[in-house]
């Protein structure tokens, strides 16, 4: 009964054709349920703080900085130990049904003297573990994209007209 109830919830919120494999034990389903509920509770805390009513699932030890500059879509999953930092001129905008893999970093800028531009992530995007997205020069990831593990993007605002000027 629990298995069918959880299937119905997953179908309604994430995947309308979802069905647990018959060989999945009930203990694994309970573990999934507890993990997702804990992630949702952590997400509610962030949603309340930023005044958003999106479903946000946060894994263990997720770090979020500059929350007032983040726009969350619905059904956003941020994996364990990931980091979101929205120090930028524009927002860190995360679309609907986005999954940020564990240990990933989505950081507009690390510089406080010349802050970065923005990061926009479209709907239905998935990131593998340990991905790094920087937004110093502005970064847009289109909808329905899949980004593999260890992917790294670092757009910058380099001055190419002066070859003697360092780019760091």
Set out the residue ranges of the language-model regions:
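Domain-scale signature associated with acetyltransferase and cell-envelope carbohydrate enzymes
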Residues: 1-154
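Proline-centered turn/helix-capping motifs that create local helix->coil transitions or kinks
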Residues: 153-162
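Surface-exposed acidic, glycine/proline-enriched linker/cap segments
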Residues: 164-168
């Amino acid at each position: 009964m629990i298995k069918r109830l959880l299937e119905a919830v997953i179908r309604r919120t994430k995947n309308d054709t979802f069905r647990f494999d018959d060989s999945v034990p009930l203990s694994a389903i309970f573990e999934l349920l507890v993990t997702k509920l804990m992630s949702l509770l952590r997400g509610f805390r962030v949603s309340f703080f930023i005044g958003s009513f999106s479903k946000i699932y946060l894994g263990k030890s997720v770090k979020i900085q500059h929350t007032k500059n983040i726009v969350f879509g619905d059904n956003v999953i941020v994996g364990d130990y990931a980091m979101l930092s929205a120090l930028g001129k524009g927002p860190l905008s995360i679309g609907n049904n986005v999954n940020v893999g564990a240990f990933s970093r989505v950081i507009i800028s690390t510089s406080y003297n010349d802050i970065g531009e923005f990061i926009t992530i479209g709907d239905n995007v998935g990131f593998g573990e340990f991905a790094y997205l920087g937004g110093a020069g502005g970064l847009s990831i289109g909808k329905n994209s899949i980004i593999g593990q260890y992917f790294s993007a670092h757009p910058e605002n380099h001055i190419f007209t002066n070859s003697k000027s360092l780019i760091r």
